[in-house]
A protein has these predicted regions:
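Basic amphipathic alpha-helical segments that dock to polyanions
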Residues: 44, 57, 72-78
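Short, locally clustered residues in the helix-turn-helix/winged-helix DNA-binding domain
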Residues: 45-49, 109, 136
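C-terminal regulatory/oligomerization modules of transcriptional regulators
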Residues: 1-4, 126-152
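Charged, amphipathic alpha-helical coiled-coil/dimerization segments
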Residues: 24, 73-133
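Alpha-helical linker/hinge and terminal dimerization helices associated
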Residues: 19, 23-26, 30, 61, ...
Length: 152
């Protein structure tokens, strides 16, 4: 790897780490009035369209199954989600939001929309769309690099 490419990789990773921290801070602020955390909002959001097994949520979110399991159990304990039987797998139950869970996510909607407008107005809607496309493409490429780290 050339020094220039190594620098590009470092700058990209550090930039994404910084963005991750910034987006998590925003998500915490948006979720708090609804009685959620960013992580709980993220897991609930993953199952709004359809119930999913914990492993499926983890794959979609790019985090460990154990982390999702812990959050899912908390959501169920608080009445925001429930486990349902999974016809495809007897032991891997499906996580689904309850009406209370859907209501909590819905309470985030107006503040989320207002922040989305502020961000698009400040950054530029076309620029934001381009950034999203680029980040999605980068994620696909990284997924295909198997293993992610190789010997020189």
């Amino acid at each position: 790897m050339s020094r220039a490419r190594q620098e590009l990789l470092s700058r990209t990773a550090l930039g994404v780490f910084r963005l991750n921290g910034q987006f998590l801070a925003v998500a915490e602020e948006l979720a708090r009035p609804a009685g959620l955390t960013a992580a709980r909002w993220q897991v609930l959001g993953a199952v709004l369209a359809e119930p999913l097994p914990v492993a499926g949520i983890a794959r979609a979110m790019g985090i460990t199954r154990q982390s999702v399991q812990r959050i899912a159990d908390l959501l169920v304990e608080r009445g925001l989600a429930e486990y349902r039987p999974n016809p495809a797998h007897r032991r891997a139950k499906l996580l689904a939001p309850t009406e209370a869970g859907r209501a909590a996510v819905a309470r985030i909607g107006p503040r989320h929309a207002a922040f989305a407008d502020r961000l698009a107005d400040s950054f530029g809607e076309a620029e934001l769309a381009s950034a999203v496309e680029l980040l999605e493409r980068l994620a696909v490429v990284l997924d295909k690099l198997d293993p992610a780290v190789t010997e020189p």
